[in-house]
Amino acid sequence: MLDQNQLKKYNQEHLSEYEKLMSSNEKEKLESKVNELDLESIQQLFQDLYVNRQSISDVSSVSEVKYQRKTELTDQEGAKYEQKGIEAIRNGEFAVLLMAGGQGTRLGYKGPKGSFEIKGVSLFELQARQLLKLKKETGHLINWYIMTSDINHEETLSYFEQHDYFGYNPDNVHFFKQENMVALCETGQLVLNEQGYIMETPNGNGGVFKSLEKNGYLDKMASDGVKFIFLNNIDNVLVKVLDPLFAGFTVVNDCDVTSKSIQPKDGESVGRLVNQNSKDTVLEYSELDEAVANTFDNANIGIHAFKVAFIKQAVNNDLPYHLAVKKLKQLDEDFGVVEKPTLKFELFYFDIFRYATSFVTLQVNREDEFSPLKNKEGKDSVETATSDLERLNLI
């Protein structure tokens, strides 16, 4: 039986009503899961991030990041960075980390987002091609680490196997799953998914480093002599995966965190790379007052390089949760399936920046390096991604 006092204390009494309609086996699973949860912490998250949520309007502690515009590099500087990058890649100083835990639902596609194809070429293949090109240029096959999630892990592995890893050596591709976090309804109560279990959703990309560590991959990188982790996500179809110039820029500056950015447009719903309290960080657009957001010159495009030594030192430090509200299918009080606004609590990888001591950013051209694929139609859509890939002769 569920602990009624605990349920009442933390606003979860509705679970008793669900329990009455469950089989013995279902009751056992529900009780086991609820007993695993820290209901006090979950309620505190609900209060802090939903009930008392605020946008950031005071920018007294926020300033522009230290950055270099790629367009302002001289030919000699660009060539120097490229050469340094090629040397570092050849010497095995970089690993590549891809965050690919999402589904293609918003594209009208059933399956891992990375397996979505544009004119017969999947997002995974677009990135694999670039890594294979680097192998030709440097003679070194980079270890490729790919973070999946419970919702797409098996399908992702199957997709790679069906496509012979796009010509990549399977021994150099390492898959691991991000962890989950419970979801809540807008009154702070746990919800049941369509299968009747406590709903959990991927805990955001901020769990990427702990998941790397848990799977032994941080230790592997260190033992392999890897000094930097190049990180990117599956959304950006124009990402330059570990381009030598950025690799060289990373090596020469030798910072804990090296980032790429673009000049944001006013009102653009993209996080801003800023310096807050003497630390570089990303402030999500949804967390900023709009007028404040428009004062900063660097939009985060999810491309960074991290020192392995820094990540190993900071990996177990606490990161804050952020709130996302999304319509998700769940069970109502009669066990019918409904779709309702649901609170998801997510960790963001960039919150690890607060533990770093050195930062630098390279601002690149949007037209060359940023085209997010988020929607089936309209802005940031299949149509815009296709157009951008064709414009740069990438498909």
From Swiss-Prot:
Pfam families: UDPGP. The keyword ATP-binding does not apply. This is Probable uridylyltransferase SH0870. UTP binds at M99, A100, G101, G102, K113, Q178, G204, D235, K344. Its EC number is 2.7.7.-. InterPro entries: Nucleotide-diphossugar_trans (IPR029044), UDP-sugar_pyrophosphorylase (IPR039741), UDPGP_fam (IPR002618). Keywords: Nucleotidyltransferase, Transferase. GO terms for molecular function: uridylyltransferase activity. It comes from Staphylococcus haemolyticus (strain JCSC1435). Belongs to the UDPGP type 1 family.
